[in-house]
Amino acid sequence: MEAQADAGGDDLAAMREQCRSLEEAIGFRRETQMGLVASLQRLVPDLVPSLDRSLRIIAAFNDRPFVPTPNPDGGHGKSPAALKPHHRRALPDPARSTRRKTSPGSSPASVAAAPGGLDAVRTMVAVCLLELVPFAEIDAAALARRLQAESSSASEAERTALADLAAELGGSAASAVVLALRRIAEDTGGVQIEEAMIGGKSMTMVWAIDRNKLLKELPESATLPLLQPPPAPQMPPSETDAGSAMIPRTPQQQQPQPDMWPHSMPPIFPRPRGMTMQGMQRVPGVPPGLMPLQRPFMGPAGVITMGGGVGPSPNQQKQKSEEDELKDLELLLNKKTYREKQNTKTGEELLDLIHRPTAKETAVAAKFKTKGGSQLKEYCTNLTKEDCRRQSGSFVACDKVHFRRIIAPHTDTNLGDCSFLDTCRHTKTCKYVHYELDQTPDIPPMMAGALAPPRQIRLQRAEYCSEVELGEAQWINCDIRNFRMDILGQFGVIMADPPWDIHMELPYGTMADDEMRTLNVPALQTDGLIFLWVTGRAMELGRECLELWGYKRVEEIIWVKTNQLQRIIRTGRTGHWLNHSKEHCLVGIKGNPLVNRNIDTDVIVAEVRETSRKPDEMYPMLERISPRTRKLELFARMHNAHAGWLSLGNQLNGVRLVDEGLRARYKAAYPDSEVQPPSPPRASAPIDGDQGTSQKPTVSDGERPA
């Protein structure tokens, strides 16, 4: 009966203590709210009357007496300063009501073993902050979410304690975490927190932590000095010493086997929190189900204690020098504030939004994609089918493109591959190894009947308009230096590959620099783009010519040259000092043309062919940039003739014109010249080159540059 009376007295005392704690919390909240009202009244003078009107309506609706709001200027004039973290009054501990007083008949170990309340939440917060390696600033709400996540290392008992504390505070788990952070900052200084009002909401940020001080929040740090090895029980003298007979001991005489791993070190086989090891002794102050020292104990200097010692040795305790403190201070001053981080984040989001393609740009880019997927076939890295079968260990080579070695009677395989491969000018006498495409099937025709037929690679063409819309290829054999450019009309795109005089032996004639400067290129364009191929010393001369012709250089395309085996060329006959593996194409703009931007890249990787022949990838790329416009190529040869292009050069086969307007003007200027075909096809619509613009007015899939 006396024990029951004592227990009832303890419960009554606990209830009184809880009531007093709640009253303190209510009073503190009221003071805080009055401080907020006082700070807001400076911005909104009629704040208190408006609050009183609302409270009066609520009181009348609930049949309760109305108490006017006191004037906040009377006693809360300095309330905003009280909201700062270092001036904030300590909150009452509502978790004290969950701690029962030790009864005379209970042991301290059993009382300390019950987890819960503020102490358990402080431990959870400390563990979560220590797990942030490296540490990054975090707010209380995010910290609460990490504690409540399933991946958290907190046990169910600790999560229950967090929920109970949040319920006692009358808020969410974030309020319990805020209370724990304040207590840690006030008691040990393990965290540096700052509270601010953002968007009308209170936010608590953890800016920095002290790991050495946070370790004191862990229960194993508090119980470590109490760990003492259990005294060895006094055993009676063994009867085996007296005689040679082995007498089994009784269960009362059997000594418990000690652990193989000392208690002052973390277990050699760590387990999840909540699991215990049989034979491990209970440690006072550690909740049941929680193993002591699951984390290695770290002393004040951050040194892990080894062996059975309690702390680091004196020679390990190194005090921070003045230079280290200055570095820490400088690092703290250079840290971005929360507002600076928010501004940086906002700026990054704006940049991402600005550089993101618009819906129109995305639709235009989708229009130029190849229908039916990519039409490219990959080259096998093993080069030949024999090497492919040998490397893969199969009887059949892969379905990629392979080559076949050409072994002539004069070929010496010990010399290796020819540097020029299919561009070699002495294939009949060259002793190096050459290659050709291996088109022979790797599977006999009898067996290939059951397999799917190989996909045929078709020639690349514009998928967004028909060949009839592009028109037929046209060309004029002439001397560009004295040809009448004014009869050609206006063009949207011009591409030129001039025979620059680069002071080298070339298989074709060259033009002097002054002849290039005086070309009548300005008569060909008022609004459009020009693509000028340059090499060697002609790079600077090409830029000068663009400026003289009225263009502004805006881009530069690089052609990376590859050989027959799709490898970068390392040897060649160009370059005074280094072997040239690339060529440059200057891009100039005149006027305000209608073009598609950000469709293609400025790098082309293509195989070299005849001398001075440029990659065919240029023609579809220029059609994508300026679709359905007239296009002209200067210094062209017969392999440059493409649909929709007019070619000029002195190595073309006569004159071929299908545009009736252009034929009429050419015959008027050069009546003695023969034009093919004798009568142009009626299906081709004439294009009036006398118009003042180089684009059709109906084109709507481009944009004018700013």
UniProtKB/Swiss-Prot annotation:
GO molecular function: methyltransferase activity; mRNA m(6)A methyltransferase activity; RNA binding
EC assignment: 2.1.1.348
Keywords annotated in UniProt: Methyltransferase, Nucleus, RNA-binding, S-adenosyl-L-methionine, Transferase
One Gene Ontology CC term in the entry: nucleus
Catalytic activity: an adenosine in mRNA + S-adenosyl-L-methionine = an N(6)-methyladenosine in mRNA + S-adenosyl-L-homocysteine + H(+)
Ranges of Low complexity composition bias in the record: 103-114
Major site of localization recorded for this protein: nucleus
Top enzyme class: transferase
Localisation: Nucleus
Binding site for S-adenosyl-L-methionine: 479-480, 497, 614, 637-640, 650-651
InterPro entries attached to this UniProt entry: MT-A70-like, SAM-dependent_MTases_sf
One Pfam family recorded for the sequence: MT-A70
Protein family membership: Belongs to the MT-A70-like family.
Function: Probable N6-methyltransferase that methylates adenosine residues of some mRNAs. N6-methyladenosine (m6A), which is present at internal sites of some mRNAs, may play a role in the efficiency of mRNA splicing, transport or translation.
Protein name per its UniProtKB record: Probable N(6)-adenosine-methyltransferase MT-A70-like
